[in-house]
UniProtKB/Swiss-Prot annotation:
This is tRNA-cytidine(32) 2-sulfurtransferase. HAMAP family: TtcA (MF_01850). Its main location: cytoplasm. Its EC number is 2.8.1.-. A motif (PP-loop motif) lies at residues 37-42.
Length: 255
């Protein structure tokens, strides 16, 4: 089934195209591994990258990669059916991440951070196996802003995410094409196109990341007074004035 090319489609496509152009996310000849979890964000990213691939002046390839972490009830088959029906090149990877997490996790600690690290490592490995020099992740605008606030409020660091960065393996470049796409646009777009959203089935999903939930609630409160607050916070990430910060490493004069 083809995507519904309505106003929402055009807005998201334009935002993704803008991000690719501004941050040089995809170049001629790139082979991009696209992490597809089965959530609304990764489906949206995959379909937008494919839409642009067919229309863009540069040639690039996509390989959809799904990681099954081994949580009971996870329906990887539904994701695979969607990928197959839409003609994507894809790879489904079954792992024992859940068993590793259950063994290594400290009491009362979150599954999320360990799970994310394991998934990321597997994605890097598979990207290399499939000859991909880029790995696309489905973090949207709200994720960037929430991460900025989380680091400020709970870590004491002025840090968010990068739209493009070289991974720790020194080989794969991680890209985030949804940086300009707000979650509120993805939700109806995913619903209207009937993407078969699959829950990760983590036993603590929806309860572990309470700090991020607090940031979401804070932003919702701020938006009621200032509807442009998210746009302003995202703009701040590209409008940095080092002389007005306290990090001596940023203001130290060269010797």
């Amino acid at each position: 089934m083809a995507l519904i090319e309505d106003a929402a489609f055009t807005r998201i496509k334009n935002r993704v195209g803008k991000a690719i152009a501004e941050f040089d996310l995809i170049s001629e000849g790139d082979r991009v591994a696209v992490a597809v979890s089965g959530g609304k964000d990764s489906y949206t990213m995959l379909h937008m990258l494919e839409t642009l691939r067919r229309r863009a002046p540069v040639r690039y390839e996509l390989v959809a990669i799904n990681i099954d972490s081994g949580y009971r009830g996870y329906r990887a088959d539904i994701i695979e059916e969607h990928l197959r029906e839409h003609g994507f090149t894809y790879h489904m990877e079954k792992t024992d991440h859940y068993d590793i997490i259950s063994e290594k996790r400290r009491p009362n600690s979150s599954y999320c951070s360990i799970c994310a690290r394991l998934k990321r490592g597997t994605l890097y490995t598979l990207a290399q196996q499939y000859g991909c020099n880029k790995l696309a992740l489905g973090h949207h605008m709200d994720d960037f802003i929430e991460t900025l606030l989380l680091n400020q409020f709970f870590v004491g660091s002025l840090k968010a995410m990068a739209p493009s960065m070289l991974a720790d393996n020194g080989v794969t470049t991680v890209i985030r094409p949804l940086v300009y796409v707000p979650e509120k646009e993805i939700i109806p777009f995913s619903r209207n196109n009937r993407f078969p959203v699959v829950c990760c089935c983590c036993p603590v999903c929806g309860t572990a990341d309470l700090q991020r939930k607090k940031m979401k609630e804070l932003l919702e409160t701020l938006e009621r007074d200032n509807p442009l607050v998210k746009k302003s916070l995202l703009t701040a990430l590209s409008n940095v004035h080092p002389r007005h910060l306290l990090d001596k490493g940023l203001t130290r004069k060269p010797s």
